[in-house]
């Protein structure tokens, strides 16, 4: 008996360390899968010349990628309760690596646009899984930081794409895809040898004290909600989950806000280098790469620092104190965002972009955390899949193409019009976040009243 306890403890510790290793692998996958975006956006002229594209067709690279994500998110949401998390993630990573090699097989623009759609399709299983896994297993006080880390890894991936193009040369922009494919194959191997248990989303209920258990049983609303979950668990499917989520006001407002924040961020990264080269007229590629590298690190890292500074104030995204600071972050991000289109030099454009990304990167993890945590744990993966579908349809899939169309039509007269139009959409998120803050505070007030009633019953 004495020997069994230390062995059990060692097993728990190994489990925790291995879960941390799994988080590192998954977060790095999120980053590496975005290297392709950096490779394409840093060599816009060379890609368009090599594949004989105009701005609108180049923008379809981003659009096709998003529509691949839409299809994948839909399938993942529908099959979420039936498929293995391990194998959906592993196969997604493996096939993503294989499809990257297609850029070395053909120069046909239409074929490669379709391949970019396949990239988006295979990217979604790990992209959906990681945030839900963090919300399930991470220490509560560090959830926002870990979600920010995942977001930071995505930006670093784009930065690595710029650096690879600088190393190999813009005319050899395809070579970076080999580096990306190689690392993803290594990650595929790591996932293959990992036990299914480490991908499990089984819900764990912490042991309650006698007093907490008594309060829980007295609270009728909580008890009835738990009973309803048990009765409906076997009847759940994608469409029933969709019906429940569509009636959830906090969830829908979170999705609308995330669509805007994530979509504008995606479009900015996709077209920023082209904006610097063709609107600011910065022709020094080394200078553009250096500035973009600074943007990639300073923006999200600044957002992470801002979240750390705000932590004593907002505690976590589950706290009611996070609501109104989130609105202020978004207003500030919107102001800096629209100012990017009016900048005249590379330096001022870089500074405005960094300021925008700092506040955007601070707000996005909080919105994403609220989105996942405001619904039942069983609905987390489906809810995030639906959020991804709507994000790709409404913003991430349309804004790169919209930028290209506006740029093709008006770049001779108003070269900065496309950037101004896209970044002005950032203000649309403000009223959604105001409504979200109001409804969250109202919900917390109701929960406090129910808690007080429960305590009164316990005293009696």
Regions found by a protein language model. Give the residues of each.
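Helix-breaking motifs and short loop linkers at transmembrane-helix boundaries and internal kinks
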Residues: 52, 84, 105-110, 122, ...
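Cytoplasmic helix-loop-helix junction between adjacent transmembrane helices
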Residues: 115-154
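Conserved MFS/SLC helix-loop-helix module at the cytosolic interface between two early adjacent transmembrane helices
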Residues: 71-110
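Cytosolic juxtamembrane N-terminal segment immediately preceding the first transmembrane helix
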Residues: 1-35, 49
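Residue-level signature of mid-helix packing/kink "hotspots" within the transmembrane helices
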Residues: 38, 65-74, 124, 158-159, ...
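Extracytoplasmic gate region of multi-pass secondary transporters
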Residues: 40-41, 248-304, 364, 368, ...
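Symmetry-related core transmembrane helices of the 12-TM Major Facilitator Superfamily/SLC fold
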Residues: 175-193, 417-436
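Structural signature of the two symmetry-related core transmembrane helices
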Residues: 87-101, 321-338
């Amino acid at each position: 008996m004495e020997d069994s306890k230390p062995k059990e403890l060692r097993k728990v510790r190994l489990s925790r360390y291995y879960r941390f290793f799994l988080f590192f692998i998954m977060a790095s996958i999120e980053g590496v899968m975005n290297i392709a975006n950096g490779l394409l956006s840093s060599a816009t002229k060379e890609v368009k010349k090599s594949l004989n594209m105009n701005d609108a067709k180049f923008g379809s690279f981003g659009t096709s990628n998003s529509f691949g994500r839409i299809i994948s998110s839909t399938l993942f949401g529908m099959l979420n309760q039936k498929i293995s998390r391990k194998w959906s993630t592993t196969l997604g990573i493996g096939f993503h690596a294989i499809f990257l090699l297609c850029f070395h097989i053909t120069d046909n623009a239409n074929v490669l646009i379709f391949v970019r759609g396949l990239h988006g399709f295979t990217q979604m299983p790990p992209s959906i899984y990681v945030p839900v896994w963090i919300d399930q297993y991470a220490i509560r006080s560090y959830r926002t930081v870990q979600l920010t880390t995942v977001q930071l890894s995505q930006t670093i991936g784009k930065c690595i794409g710029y650096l690879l193009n600088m190393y190999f040369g813009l005319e050899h922009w395809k070579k970076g895809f080999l580096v990306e494919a190689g690392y993803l194959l290594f990650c595929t191997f790591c996932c293959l040898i990992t036990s299914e248990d480490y991908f499990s989303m089984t819900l764990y209920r912490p042991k309650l004290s006698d007093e907490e258990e008594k309060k829980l049983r007295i609270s009728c609303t909580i008890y009835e909600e738990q009973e309803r979950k048990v009765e409906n668990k076997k009847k759940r499917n994608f469409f029933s989950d969709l019906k429940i989520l569509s009636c959830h006001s906090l969830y829908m407002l979170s999705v609308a806000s995330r669509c805007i924040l994530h979509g504008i961020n995606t479009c900015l990264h996709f077209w920023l280098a082209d904006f610097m080269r063709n609107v600011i007229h910065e022709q020094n590629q080394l200078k553009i790469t250096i500035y973009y590298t600074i943007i990639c690190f300073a923006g999200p890292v600044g957002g992470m620092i801002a979240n750390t500074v705000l932590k004593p104030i907002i505690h976590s995204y589950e706290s009611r104190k996070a609501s109104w600071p989130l609105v202020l972050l978004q207003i500030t991000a919107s102001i800096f965002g629209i100012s990017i289109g009016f900048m005249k030099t590379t330096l001022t454009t870089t500074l405005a972009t960094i300021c925008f990304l700092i506040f955007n990167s601070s707000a996005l993890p909080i919105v994403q955390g609220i989105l996942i945590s405001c619904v039942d744990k069983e609905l987390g993966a489906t809810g995030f899949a639906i959020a991804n579908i709507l994000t790709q349809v409404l913003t991430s899939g349309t804004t790169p193409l919209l930028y290209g169309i506006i740029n093709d039509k008006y770049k001779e007269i108003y070269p900065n019009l496309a950037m101004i139009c896209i970044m002005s959409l950032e203000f649309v998120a403000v009223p959604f976040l105001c409504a979200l803050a109001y409804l969250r505070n109202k919900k917390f007030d109701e929960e406090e009243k129910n808690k007080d009633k429960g305590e009164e019953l316990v005293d009696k």
